[in-house]
Amino acid sequence: MLKLRHIAAVLVYNLIAVHLPNSHQRFNFGGGRLRALCAREMLACCGQDINIERNARFGRNVELGDHSGIGVNASIADGTRIGRDVMMGPDCVILNRNHRIDDVTIPMRLQGYSDIQPVTIENDVWIGGRVTIFPV
């Protein structure tokens, strides 16, 4: 039954909710509420009073704390943990791996990628618009 709820939430989110207007717009047709409802079934862990904005994309193993939001057009990789009271501007990207840069004698494009690593954003953080976050 839980798997069916998850599948239904993914379908509703990707086919309808993601396209509804931003939550702060005057006539948003309940887009923010519908996206939050779907996110509760889709995220690994989901706090209270969350906000998911239009066209936000996130992996399955993402955690979102109380009173936090995912901004417009955000892209959040699997394994990301977002704490409480986090504000995120538009067009943010959180990645879970990077290019290897170990050997300066070899071009980066030939060194491949680092291993996948989780990213943790602590409590009470403001992530400005168009920020890209890489794992350490």
Task: State where each predicted segment sits.
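Flexible, glycine/small-residue-enriched loop-and-beta-strand segment within the central core
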Residues: 29, 35-36, 57-64, 69-136
